[in-house]
């Protein structure tokens, strides 16, 4: 990405991980003079090898009056980090790589921003997948995979995943479409309060021409009702929605709006939930329709068991479990948001549906690895909070649940109503004692030394069952007590599965 605005300007970059190095690369190619630093010596040493012309000087020695901007990596908290205080003392603009990208893109290039506590990576990828299948030149990145400044310069549409860390840094946002999927407590240690966390998410929809907002979540439903811009509600629950609704057909030929407001407030409201997205009517009666029934199994059709006629209604189309490669329960909200975004962009319904059917999903997200004897193995390492784990637990029954790590606010108390699905829990990490207290007298559990110990014990226990068992790694916790990230945790689980499968195959030869 060409950042011509910063040609011959002095720009400071702090935080020399993937995002910071991406910013240095783009700024250097654009003719900026770079001053780079990091809190960690090894990061500085690595950057020095890559960018020998940069000035690697401690920020306390900068002439801040000559610095045009400080580009801050999302891993660096704005409060109370010393570099932020230093820059503010000299009224230096603090920017994120996303802001540099939005400044540099051309006016005819569309940007879709996706955020939410859960589901944003899958939604971002699915939108990109469908747009590519529709023949659009698409670039996908941000918090997911490729930093935005490394994306192709000539894309028609950019689909960007935005985390709360990235949004926190942003002062100005201007995107064509935003998708806010849900908000539940997360990253409170970074943001200081739930109110601050919510405020980061609001930045995105407030800076968008059209906002797609999930309304099955109390917080985001409230945001939807108060938001006065052009907005689209999505829902996958039975609960009737208290929103004015029009059909997507009424918007088919309507271009993206150039303003957010009309005289009467919101331009129109488009509902994907007029007749409820998820249809369980053939299988379920008399349940609490505010949420899925914890006594009913919503199993993946690949298992060959459970309810197989669950369908997702999207206008005149219906998707069943067997139609898609991804877990329908876990991804219903993601699919609904994707459908809305693609319709606003003018993609026809058949192309969207075919794209949903052909999408293979992402690693570590309710990922069915395979079966050994009577035991299925599911890698849901991305589930770093209770709400995310809830969707996985609702997808299976007879579960040996591997859970734990660095706990988020609220822990797993909200999952107690689903403990009937869990035959035994195998607890790991810092949260072990707290999770054990919640499970006491409700579900059997064992405290494990580590993931390897939990994997071994869960499999040994499952072999004692005459029924099929699912070993589910869905930690409901961050990974940072034992791993670099959720990917590393998930890869370790996958290696354990592959080693076990190899050993059992050898035994059968």
From Swiss-Prot:
Subcellular location: Cytoplasm
Binding locations of ATP: 116-122
Protein name according to UniProt: UDP-N-acetylmuramoylalanine--D-glutamate ligase
Superkingdom per UniProt: Bacteria
Keyword Cell wall biogenesis/degradation: yes
Record GO biological process: cell division; cell wall organization; peptidoglycan biosynthetic process; regulation of cell shape
EC number(s) from the headed UniProt entry: 6.3.2.9
Recorded GO MF terms: ATP binding; tetrahydrofolylpolyglutamate synthase activity; UDP-N-acetylmuramoylalanine-D-glutamate ligase activity
Taxonomic lineage of the native organism: Bacteria, Pseudomonadati, Pseudomonadota, Alphaproteobacteria, Rickettsiales
Pfam families from the UniProt entry: Mur_ligase_M (PF08245), MurD-like_N (PF21799)
The protein's annotated pathway: Cell wall biogenesis; peptidoglycan biosynthesis
Keyword Ion transport appears in the UniProt entry: no
Catalysis: reaction(s): UDP-N-acetyl-alpha-D-muramoyl-L-alanine + D-glutamate + ATP = UDP-N-acetyl-alpha-D-muramoyl-L-alanyl-D-glutamate + ADP + phosphate + H(+)
InterPro entries listed in its UniProt record: Folylpolyglutamate_synth_CS, Mur-like_cat_sf, Mur_ligase_C_dom_sf, Mur_ligase_cen, MurD, NAD(P)-bd_dom_sf
Membership in a protein family: Belongs to the MurCDEF family.
Keyword annotations of the record: ATP-binding, Cell cycle, Cell division, Cell shape, Cell wall biogenesis/degradation, Cytoplasm, Ligase, Nucleotide-binding, Peptidoglycan synthesis
Function text: Cell wall formation. Catalyzes the addition of glutamate to the nucleotide precursor UDP-N-acetylmuramoyl-L-alanine (UMA).
GO cellular component: cytoplasm
């Amino acid at each position: 990405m060409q950042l011509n605005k910063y040609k011959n300007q002095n720009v400071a970059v702090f935080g020399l991980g993937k995002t910071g190095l991406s910013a240095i690369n783009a700024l250097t190619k654009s003719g900026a003079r770079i001053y780079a630093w990091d809190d960690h010596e090894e990061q500085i040493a690595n950057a020095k090898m890559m960018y020998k012309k940069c000035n690697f000087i401690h920020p306390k020695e900068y002439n801040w009056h000559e610095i045009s901007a400080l580009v801050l990596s999302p891993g660096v908290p704005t409060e109370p980090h010393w570099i932020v205080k230093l820059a503010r003392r000299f009224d230096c603009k603090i920017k994120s790589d996303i802001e540099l990208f939005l400044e540099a893109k051309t006016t005819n290039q569309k940007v879709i921003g996706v955020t939410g506590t859960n589901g944003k990576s899958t939604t971002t990828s699915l939108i990109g997948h469908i747009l590519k299948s529709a023949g659009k030149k698409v670039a996908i990145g941000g918090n997911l995979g490729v930093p935005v400044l490394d994306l192709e310069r000539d894309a028609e549409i950019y689909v960007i995943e935005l985390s709360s860390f990235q949004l926190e840094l942003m002062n100005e946002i201007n995107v064509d479409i935003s998708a806010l999927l849900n908000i539940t407590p997360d990253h409170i240690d970074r943001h200081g309060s739930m109110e601050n966390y919510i405020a980061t998410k609001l930045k995105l929809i407030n800076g968008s021409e059209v906002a797609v907002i999930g309304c099955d979540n109390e917080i985001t439903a409230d945001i939807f009702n108060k938001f006065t811009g052009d907005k689209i509600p999505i829902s996958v629950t039975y609960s009737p929605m208290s929103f004015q609704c029009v059909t997507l057909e009424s918007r088919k030929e309507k271009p993206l709006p150039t303003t957010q407001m009309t005289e009467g407030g919101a331009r129109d409201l488009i509902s994907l939930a007029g007749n409820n997205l998820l249809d369980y009517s053939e299988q379920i009666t008399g349940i609490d329709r505010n949420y899925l029934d914890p006594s009913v199994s919503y199993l993946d059709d690949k298992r060959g068991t459970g309810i197989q006629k669950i369908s997702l209604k999207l206008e005149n189309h219906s998707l069943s479990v067997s139609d898609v490669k991804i877990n329908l329960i876990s991804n219903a909200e993601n699919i609904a948001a994707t459908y809305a975004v693609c319709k606003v962009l003018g993609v026809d319904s058949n192309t969207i549906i075919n794209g949903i059917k052909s999408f293979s999903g992402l690693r570590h997200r309710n990922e069915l690895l395979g079966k050994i004897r009577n035991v299925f193995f599911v890698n849901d390492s991305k589930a770093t909070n209770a709400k995310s784990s809830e969707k996985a637990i609702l997808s299976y029954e007879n579960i040996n649940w591997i859970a734990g790590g660095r706990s988020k606010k609220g822990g797993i108390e909200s999952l107690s109503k689903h403990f009937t699905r869990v035959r035994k829990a195998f607890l790991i990490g810092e949260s072990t004692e707290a999770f054990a207290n919640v499970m006491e007298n409700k579900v059997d559990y064992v405290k494990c030394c580590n993931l390897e110990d939990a994997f071994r014990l869960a499999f040994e226990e499952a072999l004692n069952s005459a029924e099929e068992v699912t070993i589910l790694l869905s930690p409901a916790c961050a990974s940072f007590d034992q791993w670099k990230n959720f990917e590393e945790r998930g890869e370790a689980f996958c290696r354990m599965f592959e080693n076990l499968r190899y050993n059992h195959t050898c035994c059968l030869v």
